[in-house]
Amino acid sequence: MSIVSLLGIKVLNNPAKFTDPYEFEITFECLESLKHDLEWKLTYVGSSRSLDHDQELDSILVGPVPVGVNKFVFSADPPSAELIPASELVSVTVILLSCSYDGREFVRVGYYVNNEYDEEELRENPPAKVQVDHIVRNILAEKPRVTRFNIVWDNENEGDLYPPEQPGVDDEEEEDDEEEDDDEDDEDDEDDDQEDGEGEAEEAAEEEEEEEEKTEDNETNLEEEEEDIENSDGDEEEGEEEVGSVDKNEDGNDKKRRKIEGGSTDIESTPKDAARSTN
């Protein structure tokens, strides 16, 4: 947790000439009393191709810092045009406003800066030699890029970040981990057994359903066979009535026999018909 929090930055003179100083109104909050001062620094990026052209415009120490919300104005001199490549004097660059505590940077704010000529004729026809007096800067104050870093403050040290080792604690933790692993394995085995039991129960239920279906099919077939037998018996009784109704002559048995033998060839004789024909 950061003891100092940046609440806001206001650019006071913007736009301005290239040769005018930079001015920022900075507001920050301090949560605890600090042993050291805060160092604020402004850096001008002279070239996008090399760090050699970066210029530290100014740096100040702010302190002692009281607890609560604080505000101050930070002023810095403009960059030296002689240290900037001529091809990058009239272009877009970056300025960096940073704050450090006890040599450790914990916040950095970057702004884009557009440098251009103040006259339309110079913008359309740039002179061979850069005229610094006619360059104006415009800081894009509405779009800062803020970067924060975690550092060690007065109430913190390396020992606080990493608790001391306690003999025997690691062994106990390992044993607890092993017991937890064993418990998890047992639970997994129980779950597997339960799943196997459920699977076997489902299979048994399916087999019972299949057997019940087979039994129902057999019963249905038996009922159909019984109906067929009853129907065949009814047909035989009708046949006997027809045979008995034939007028008898002197040889009644012969007349009955002729009627049966003269029937359709598609009718299959039953054992009863065969027995009747022999009588």
From Swiss-Prot:
Phenotype for residue 96 to D: Reduces acetylation of histone H3 on 'K-56' and enhances sensitivity to bleomycin, camptothecin, HU and MMS
Signal peptide: none
Region (Disordered): 156-279
Misc. comment: Present with 6230 molecules/cell in log phase SD medium.
Record note on quaternary structure: Interacts with histone H3/H4 heterodimers via both histone H3 and histone H4. Binds with higher affinity to H3/H4 heterodimers where histone H3 has been pre-acetylated on 'Lys-14'. Interacts with RAD53 and this may impair interaction with histones and chromatin assembly; the interaction is reduced upon activation of DNA damage or replication checkpoints which in turn promotes histone binding and chromatin assembly. Interacts with the CAC2 subunit of chromatin assembly factor 1 (CAF-1). Interacts with the HIR1, HIR2, HIR3 and HPC2 subunits of the HIR complex.
Similarity section: Belongs to the ASF1 family.
GO biological process terms, semicolon-separated: cellular response to stress; chromatin organization; DNA replication-dependent chromatin assembly; negative regulation of DNA damage checkpoint; nucleosome assembly; nucleosome disassembly; positive regulation of transcription elongation by RNA polymerase II; protein modification process
PANTHER family xref list: ANTI-SILENCING PROTEIN 1 (PTHR12040), HISTONE CHAPERONE ASF1 (PTHR12040:SF0)
GO cellular component: chromatin; chromosome, telomeric region; cytosol; H3 histone acetyltransferase complex; nucleus
Intracellular or extracellular location(s): Nucleus
Annotated spans, Interaction with HIR1: 1-143
Function: Histone chaperone that facilitates histone deposition and histone exchange and removal during nucleosome assembly and disassembly. Facilitates histone deposition through both replication-dependent and replication-independent chromatin assembly pathways. Cooperates with chromatin assembly factor 1 (CAF-1) to promote replication-dependent chromatin assembly and with the HIR complex to promote replication-independent chromatin assembly, which may occur during transcription and DNA repair.
Keywords: Chaperone, Chromatin regulator, Coiled coil, Nucleus, Transcription, Transcription regulation
Consequence when changing residue 145 to E: Abrogates interaction with histone H3 and histone H4, abrogates transcriptional silencing, reduces transcriptional activation, reduces acetylation of histone H3 on 'K-9' and 'K-56' and enhances sensitivity to HU and MMS
Gene3D superfamilies named among the record's database cross-references: Histone chaperone ASF1-like
Coiled-coil portions: 192-243
Protein's recorded name: Histone chaperone ASF1
GO MF: acetyltransferase activator activity; histone binding
Region: Interaction with histone H3, histone H4, RAD53 and the RF-C complex, residue numbers: 1-155
Effect after changing residue 48 to R: Abrogates interaction with histone H3 and histone H4 and enhances transcriptional silencing. Reduces acetylation of histone H3 on 'K-9' and 'K-56'
Pfam name, any one: ASF1_hist_chap
